[in-house]
From Swiss-Prot:
NCBIfam families: metG (TIGR00398), PRK00133.1 (NF001100). GO terms for molecular function: ATP binding; metal ion binding; methionine-tRNA ligase activity; tRNA binding. Homodimer. The lineage of its organism: Archaea, Methanobacteriati, Methanobacteriota, Stenosarchaea group, Halobacteria. It comes from the Archaea. One of its GO terms (cellular component) is cytosol. The gene is metG. GO terms for biological process: methionyl-tRNA aminoacylation. This is Methionine--tRNA ligase. SUPFAM superfamilies: Anticodon-binding domain of a subclass of class I aminoacyl-tRNA synthetases (SSF47323), Methionyl-tRNA synthetase (MetRS), Zn-domain (SSF57770), Nucleic acid-binding proteins (SSF50249), Nucleotidylyl transferase (SSF52374).
C-alpha cells in the first residue's frame, strides 16, 4: 500500500530493526539498513522532513548467553559490538541521524514511562505461569535459554519464537519438550508470577490498524491470521538480571526485568528524542512524530483525524519480526497514548550462492570482509537494492556481483558519464552554451515523476533503477547522434547533443544519490557543482550545470576475474573448515561417550540430547509413515517459510503445509520422494488445512526418502 500524500506537512522518521549486539554484521543484516538509508534519502529528496534512526539491541538472552560464554558482563559484551556497528554502518554510507542503544539512559527512562502508562490505564495484569527451569543449574530458562518443539507447527523452536517454522511468537511455557541450552538437559516447568500486557484490549484497534497500514503486503497480511482469534496477552517480564528493570514504583515487579521486545522498539522513540535533543526541536521535533498533535491520547480506539496531526512513522525490518512490529508494537504505542506506524516494510532474506546464509557453517559474506576486499560500499548498496523487490529474497554471489557491477555500473552508467563529460571538457571546457532539447527535458521530467512515484510506493528497487534507465537512455542518445562526427560537419548540433548529455549526467547524479550516495557526490564534484548533492531537491536535475568543469575520471572501476576467484575460494574454504570443525566436535563428543565414529566425509549437526522417555513397540506401530511423492508445491501467501504441498501417498493425494520455503526451491520439489507422517493430527496454518507431516532432518530440512523406489503408499516399519 502506498502513501500518495508524500511530502506531508508533518515530519517523518525512518527506523531500522535493531541489530542484536552479540555478533558481527554480515550482508544479510545490511540489507535492511541499506534499504532504510536509501528510503530516508529519497524522502528528503522529494521535500519530506525526515530523520533516520536506529540503535543496538543490548538486552535479551542472546546477549546474556554469549557474554557468559566469553566470561564478561553483558553490558561490556554488548557495548563492544555496539561500538563496532556504529563504526561499520557509515563505511557502507548508512548514515543515521542518531544511533543509540537500548541500555542508554534515554531508552531506559522512556521504557519505564511506557510501562507506567500501561499500568495506569489498566492494560497490565499479573498472573502465575509455567516457566521452563533447569534443575541442574536451579534457575529459570527465559527465551533462548530453552529450545524445544513449536506447539503450533511442530518445528524446532526457541523459547520465545518459532524461528524455524511458522514464525509465531511463543509465550513462556508454550514450548513443548523443552531443553535447557545451558546444560542440554530436559527442562521442567515451574510456576512463577509475571506481568502481562492485555493485548485483547487492542484487538479491534489492531484490526483497523492493519487496514490502514502501508508498506509491504507481507507486513499487512501475515499478522491478520494472528489476530483473527482471541489475542493472547503478552508476557512483558522475565526472570533475568540483564535488561531494563520493571519500574520500582509499580507494585509487584521486584527482581523482574522487562522482556527485550518491550524496550527494543521503544529505542526507536528514544533515538528520535536524542536526535531532537542534539539539533533542537526547531529543526526536528520528536514529539510531533511520535505523539498525536504532540500530546498523548490514551484509549483503545483510533480517530482517523489524528493522522493529520501526527508524524509519519516508517519501519524497515526483517520479515522474521513482523509480528513484533505489526501486533505488539502498535498495541504498546496505543496503550501509552502514542502515534501509530504509517508503514512497515518487511525485507526478504539474503542467500549466499543459491543457499541459505548460515553463520554456523560460515556460509556468509561479512561486512568487514567486503570492505577489506577494497570494493566501494555503493557497489554493494546497488546490488542489494536492485537484486529483488524489497519483500523478496536476494541471492548474493561474488560472480553475480562482478557481472552486475561490470555490466550495469561500469558498462552503462560509468561509460555514459565518462565519455559525455570528457567530450564536453575537451571540446567546450564544460557545459556547452545551448538550451536543453525538449525531448531530453521531457525524459528527465518523466524520470523525476517516476522517482516521486517510487518513493510513494516505497519501491527501493525502482528508486535505484530510475537513474540506471536514464543513463541507458543517455547511452542510446549519444550513440545515435554521434557528436564526434558532428563537431566538424554540424558544430551547432554537436553542442546540442553534448549539452543534453551533460544535463542527463547531472540528472543521473541527483536521482542515483539515495542508493549510490558516495558515487553521486563524486560525480557532483566532477560537474563542478557547489555544495553537496545530498542537499538538493529533484528540481535541480533540470537546472543548468556549471559552464566549466575539469577533466573527469572514471566513476566506476572494473571488477577483475582474479579478485573474484580469490574471494570465491576463500568463501569455499571457510565453509569446508566450518563443516570439518563441526564434524570433529561431534566426533569428539561421540568418542567420549564410547560410540563408534564414521570417518567418512559427512556433515554432522550439533546434536540435541536423546529423549529419555521410551515408547513401546505398540506405540510405534501406531505411527503411520508412508512413502509419498510431491506433486506440486507453492508458497503460502503471507507466510515466509511455508509451502503448500500436494503429496501422493498411493491411496490418495494429501494437502500438507510444510516449513520448507526458505530451504528448498518450490519449483524443483515436484517429483521428490518423501516420507509422510500420515496419521498426524490435522492442523490449520494460515487458513490452510495440513493433513500430515513431511519428515526432514536438521536445520537445513534435509528431506527423508527411501534408498530404492518403494511404491507410493508403502508403510515405513
Amino acid at each position: 500500500m502506498s502513501n500518495d500524500e508524500f511530502p506531508t506537512d508533518q515530519p517523518a522518521v525512518v527506523t531500522c530493526g535493531l541489530p542484536y549486539a552479540n555478533g558481527d554484521l554480515h550482508v544479510g543484516h545490511l540489507r535492511t539498513y541499506v534499504d532504510g538509508d536509501a528510503l530516508s534519502r529519497a524522502l528528503r529528496r522529494i521535500g519530506q522532513q525526515t530523520a533516520f534512526v536506529s540503535g543496538s539491541d543490548m538486552h535479551g538472552t542472546p546477549v546474556a548467553v554469549n557474554a557468559a560464554e566469553e566470561g564478561v558482563a553483558p553490558r561490556e559484551f554488548a557495548l563492544d559490538f555496539h561500538e563496532t556497528y556504529a563504526e561499520t554502518f557509515p563505511q557502507f554510507n548508512i548514515e543515521f541521524d542518531n544511533y543509540g542503544h537500548t541500555d542508554d539512559e534515554t531508552n531506559v527512562e522512556l521504557t519505564q514511562e511506557f510501562v507506567r502508562s500501561w499500568v495506569e490505564n489498566d492494560h497490565v495484569h499479573e498472573k502465575e505461569i509455567e516457566v521452563a527451569w533447569d534443575t541442574e543449574e536451579d534457575q529459570p530458562l527465559p527465551d533462548r535459554y530453552v529450545e524445544g518443539t513449536c506447539p503450533y507447527c511442530g518445528e524446532q523452536a526457541r523459547g520465545d519464537e518459532c524461528d524455524e517454522g511458522c514464525q509465531r511468537h511463543l509465550e513462556p511455557g508454550e514450548i513443548e519438550a523443552p531443553v535447557s541450552t545451558l546444560t542440554g538437559n530436559p527442562a521442567e516447568y515451574r510456576t512463577r508470577e509475571h506481568k502481562f500486557l492485555r493485548l485483547a484490549d487492542f484487538q479491534e484497534y489492531l484490526q483497523g490498524f492493519l487496514d490502514r497500514l502501508e508498506g509491504t503486503d507481507n507486513a499487512q497480511n501475515q499478522p491478520r491470521e494472528w489476530i483473527e482469534g482471541e489475542l493472547q496477552d503478552l508476557c512483558i517480564t522475565r526472570d533475568m538480571d540483564w535488561g531494563v528493570d520493571y519500574p520500582e514504583d509499580v507494585d509487584g515487579g521486584d527482581e523482574l526485568v522487562l522482556y527485550v521486545w518491550v524496550d527494543a522498539p521503544i529505542e526507536y522513540v528514544a533515538s528520535t528524542k536524542q536526535y531532537t535533543e542534539r539539533v533542537g526541536d526547531d529543526e526536528y521535533d520528536w514529539e510531533a512524530v511520535w505523539k498525536i498533535d504532540s500530546e498523548e491520547r490514551h484509549g483503545t480506539e483510533w480517530d482517523d483525524e489524528w493522522a493529520d496531526d501526527s508524524g509519519e512513522i516508517i519501519h524497515v525490518i526483517g520479515r522474521d519480526i513482523i509480528q513484533h512490529h505489526a501486533v505488539f508494537w502498535p498495541a504498546m504505542l496505543r496503550g501509552a497514548g502514542y502515534n501509530e506506524p504509517r508503514s512497515i516494510l518487511a525485507t526478504g532474506f539474503v542467500g549466499i550462492d543459491g543457499n541459505a546464509l548460515s553463520t554456523s557453517r560460515n556460509r556468509a559474506v561479512w561486512a568487514d570482509e567486503y570492505l577489506d576486499a577494497g570494493f566501494h560500499p555503493d557497489l554493494f548498496r546497488y546490488y542489494i537494492a536492485t537484486g529483488a523487490q524489497i519483500d523478496t529474497d536476494v541471492d548474493f554471489s561474488w560472480d553475480r556481483f562482478q557481472e552486475r557491477v561490470n555490466g550495469e555500473l561500469v558498462g552503462n552508467v560509468g561509460n555514459f558519464i565518462y565519455r559525455s563529460l570528457l567530450f564536453a571538457e575537451r571540446n567546450y571546457d564544460g557545459t556547452p552554451d545551448a538550451a536543453v532539447s525538449d525531448d531530453v527535458r521531457g525524459r528527465i521530467e518523466d524520470a523525476i515523476a517516476d522517482f516521486e512515484a517510487a518513493v510513494r510506493e516505497y519501491d527501493i528497487r525502482e528508486l535505484a533503477e530510475i537513474a540506471i534507465e536514464l543513463s541507458n537512455y543517455g547511452n542510446e542518445y549519444i550513440q545515435r547522434n554521434e557528436p564526434w562526427n558532428l563537431v566538424d560537419d554540424d558544430p551547432e548540433e554537436a553542442e546540442q547533443v553534448i549539452r543534453d548529455c551533460v544535463q542527463l549526467t547531472k540528472a543521473v547524479a541527483v536521482l542515483m544519490q539515495p542508493v549510490l550516495p558516495g558515487k553521486a557526490e563524486r560525480l557532483w564534484g566532477q560537474l563542478g557543482e557547489q555544495g553537496s548533492v545530498a542537499d538538493v531537491t529533484l528540481d535541480s536535475a533540470l537546472e543548468a550545470p556549471p559552464a566549466e568543469f575539469g577533466e573527469p575520471a572514471e566513476l566506476f572501476e572494473q571488477v577483475e576475474d582474479d579478485h573474484i576467484e580469490a574471494l570465491n575460494e576463500e568463501l569455499q574454504e571457510r565453509v569446508e573448515e566450518a563443516s570439518e570443525a563441526s564434524a570433529e566436535a561431534s566426533n569428539e563428543g561421540g568418542e567420549a561417550a564410547g560410540d563408534e565414529v564414521d570417518d567418512g566425509d559427512v556433515d554432522t549437526a550439533d546434536l540435541q540430547p536423546l529423549v529419555e522417555d521410551r515408547i513401546s513397540f505398540e506405540d510405534f506401530e501406531g505411527v503411520d509413515m508412508r512413502v509419498g511423492e510431491i506433486r506440486s508445491a507453492e508458497p503460502v501467501e503471507g507466510a515466509d517459510k511455508l509451502l503448500r504441498l500436494e503429496v501422493d501417498i498411493g491411496h490418495e493425494v494429501r494437502q500438507v503445509v510444510a516449513g520448507l520455503r526458505q530451504l528448498h526451491d518450490a519449483e524443483k520439489l515436484p517429483g521428490t520422494r518423501v516420507i509422510l507422517l500420515a496419521n498426524m493430527e490435522k492442523a490449520e496454518l494460515f487458513g490452510i488445512e495440513s493433513n500430515g507431516m513431511v519428515l526432514a532432518a536438521g536445520d537445513e530440512a534435509d528431506l527423508l526418502t527411501t534408498h530404492e523406489d518403494a511404491p507410493l503408499g508403502t508403510r515405513i516399519k
